[in-house]
């Protein structure tokens, strides 16, 4: 019984300390979560929308209109 109790407590600790066990303002989906602070204001160019993918720790942009690129820096022709 003591072994079971110890294993249960270890499992709870893993869940509480993992990223998946943490709560965020917005649930992550395929497009990540909205950027905050300086990234929200200046990471994307040409009116793009900044997103953050928590699982890989990367920022990217959803571009508007005729722009492409990681930060919406390229105009399509």
Curated annotation (Swiss-Prot):
Belongs to the EGF domain peptide family. This is U-actitoxin-Avd12a. PROSITE patterns: EGF_1 (PS00022), EGF_3 (PS50026). Its main location: secreted. The keyword Signal applies. Transmembrane segments: none annotated. Residues 24-29 form a propeptide. It comes from Anemonia viridis (Snakelocks anemone). It is found in: Secreted; Nematocyst. CDD domains: EGF_CA (cd00054). One of its GO terms (cellular component) is nematocyst. Disulfide bonds join 35-50, 44-61, 63-72. Residues 31-73 form the EGF-like domain. Keywords: Disulfide bond, EGF-like domain, Nematocyst, Secreted, Signal. Residues 1-23 form the signal peptide. It comes from the Eukaryota. Has both toxic and EGF activity. Its EGF activity consists of rounding cells (morphological change) and inducing tyrosine phosphorylation of the EGFR in A431 cells, but with a lower potency that human EGF.
């Amino acid at each position: 019984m003591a072994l079971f109790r110890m294993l249960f407590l270890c499992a709870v600790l893993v869940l509480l300390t993992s990223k998946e066990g943490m709560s965020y303002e917005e649930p992550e989906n395929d497009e990540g979560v909205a950027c905050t602070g300086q990234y929200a204001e200046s990471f994307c160019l040409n009116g793009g929308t900044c997103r953050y993918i928590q699982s890989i720790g990367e920022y990217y942009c959803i571009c508007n209109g005729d722009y492409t690129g990681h930060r919406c820096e390229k105009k399509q022709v």
